[in-house]
Amino acid sequence: MENAAKALSIAGGVLIAVMLAVLVYYVFTHWGDSQRASQEDIEIQQVEDFNKSYLSYEKVLYGSELLGLVNKMSDYNISDDVKYSGYSTMNLSMKITDRTTGNLFSNGTYSLSSISNAINTVMNKTVNSNKYKGQISDSQWEYLAKSSTSTKFNDLCTELKIPSSINRDQLKSDAVEYYKYVQFKRKKFKHIGTEFSNDGRVSKMSFEETN
């Protein structure tokens, strides 16, 4: 009897241990699946939110709005998401159809970096130039740009109280470049395509000049 009781006790202990092991396995597996599903939901939502902030540009844009998108993508390309999370950099394609000479961008197709570089070149020669900083405001550049081809440019400089220490010929030349930038901001561009990376995120957007 004593041996039988011992055997039953051992069998009961083994059964309880097995049941506990099964329970632990079930709980752990279920928790893991739940965590994975939750993480997947978060990632899907992140992709949707990311795309939403770019897909809103799928329309006809003014050049000024397109430059806003260029800056947005350029900032993203140097963000921590790209540096540390392994996300792909973004790109943008801009097709210029106007064959008129003397524009900021001549006829052709331009990438995100080439657009950004062209704009930075103009800004560095004008608004951000050390020789003009603190002496010519952004609003004054607008006026100077519009009159950059006028014979009354010097009169405007006097009216705007531009310091006489600034070389007028050089200023006029730089104002011509700024005017090209002003004209570009007024152009219109239609959206012609969006590409996505393997993770479902927007990776490239394409635009073409339109009337």
Identify what each model region corresponds to:
Residues 26-211:
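N-terminal export/assembly leader peptides and their processing motifs that target proteins to secretory
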